[in-house]
Amino acid sequence: GLVASIGRALGGLLADVVKSKEQPA
C-alpha cells in the first residue's frame, strides 16, 4: 500500500545516509 511504499522509501533514504557516514565520498 501507500504507507508501505513511503516506509520503504524512507528506509532506503536512511540507509543511504548511514552508508555515506560510514564511507565518506
Swiss-Prot record:
InterPro entries: Frog_Litoria (IPR032021). It comes from the Eukaryota. It is found in: Secreted. Transmembrane segments: none annotated. Keywords: Amphibian defense peptide, Antibiotic, Antimicrobial, Secreted. Pfam families: Antimicrobial24 (PF16049). Expressed by the skin parotoid and/or rostral glands. One of its GO terms (cellular component) is extracellular region. Coiled coil: none annotated. GO terms for biological process: defense response to bacterium. Its main location: secreted. Belongs to the frog skin active peptide (FSAP) family. Caerin subfamily. Antibacterial peptide, that adopts an alpha helical conformation which can disrupt bacterial membranes. Each caerin displays a different antimicrobial specificity. This is Caerin-2.5.
